[in-house]
Amino acid sequence: MLYYSQTNRQEVYEMTEPKKPPITKSFGYAFEGIFTCISKERNMKIHCVMAVLVVIAGFVLKLSAVEWCICLGLFGLVMALELVNTAVEAVVDLVTQEYKPLAKIAKDTAAGAVLIAAIMAALAGLIIFVPKGLVFLGVL
């Protein structure tokens, strides 16, 4: 693999790629990141509780396969974005602890991505669950 020198863009050098860890270690690192986020981030705990409630309601209200796919995909997206948001916040905090406008933009933008996904997931959840809930309760 060819890499450009940081000091001289004209200079190209060959570098061997670092040895990659076995796939089991890679999964271990990923799960460690997920569990760290769950244990340290309040919003991730909220997302996990909501996911459990969605699964319970899904079984009670007998969601179709398509509805399950929508629900699983959306709360998977929300949780994945929360992980990315946490990573962005950690990297920004690693780089600087003082107020910087660009650091604020990075953190706020990452948080905004989670918020948009969470709002869309909530709206989709209402569209799926409210009619089924009303039928279940005998209102419709």
Q: How would you name each of these model-derived features?
A:
Residues L2-A87, Y99-P101, A113-L140:
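Hydrophobic alpha-helical transmembrane segments
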Residues V92-T109:
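Amphipathic, cytosolic membrane-interfacial segments at TM-TM junctions
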